[in-house]
Amino acid sequence: MGCGGSRADAIEPRYYESWTRETESTWLTYTDSDALPSAAATDSGPEAGGLHAGVLEDGLSSNGVLRPAAPGGIANPEKKMNCGTQCPNSQNLSSGPLTQKQNGLWATEAKRDAKRMSAREVAINVTENIRQMDRSKRVTKNCIN
């Protein structure tokens, strides 16, 4: 054993001060795997092509030897390419539900803008009614009648 921290600390240092909910959600979003844990539990045998003890996700065992995903060299049919919203698809941009969803977002932004405008008007009205004082702390005549 060497002196100092563990190997995991050297590979992935922890920054407790900068960990926020935003970084947590980003980390959770980009570290999720395709296979669900419940699906792996039901198909978790060498015959079913599931993960074995000592086998990493990429098919390598913990000692670096390549292990087949399924018996006979057949690829696992459960493993699918799931690209979600990252795949560019021009046909989806003009579809009905997506356009409606965008219109809903635009309507929400318009409502927010209307609220912002009313807040600005209130602020303007309040500032117009403020009385001016001179240096001797006497209230001067209001400029607005």
From Swiss-Prot:
Composition-biased stretches (Polar residues): 87-105
Function: May play a synaptic role at the postsynaptic lipid rafts possibly through interaction with CAMK2A.
Lipidation (S-palmitoyl cysteine): C3
Modification after translation, per record: Palmitoylation and myristoylation target the protein to the lipid rafts.
Region annotated Disordered, chain positions: 36-56, 87-109
This protein's record includes keyword ATP-binding: no
Lineage, highest ranks first: Eukaryota, Metazoa, Chordata, Craniata, Vertebrata
Residues passing through the membrane, by range: none
Main location class: cytoplasm
Pfam families according to UniProt: BAALC_N
Signal peptide: none
Superkingdom assignment: Eukaryota
Subcellular location: Cytoplasm; Synapse, Synaptosome; Membrane raft; Postsynaptic density
InterPro entries registered for this protein in UniProt: BAALC
Oligomer and partners: Interacts with CAMK2A.
Species for this entry: Mus musculus (Mouse)
Region Interaction with CAMK2A, annotated ranges: 3-35
Expressed in which tissues: At the mRNA level, predominantly expressed in the brain. At the protein level, mainly expressed in muscle tissues. In skeletal muscles, expressed in cranial and facial muscles, muscles of the neck, back, thoracic wall, and thigh. Also found in the contractile myoepithelial cell layer of salivary glands.
Residues covalently joined to lipid (N-myristoyl glycine): G2
Keywords of this entry: Cytoplasm, Lipoprotein, Membrane, Myristate, Palmitate, Synapse, Synaptosome
GO CC entries: cytoplasm; cytosol; membrane raft; neuron projection; nucleoplasm; postsynaptic density; sarcoplasm
Designated name of the protein: Brain and acute leukemia cytoplasmic protein
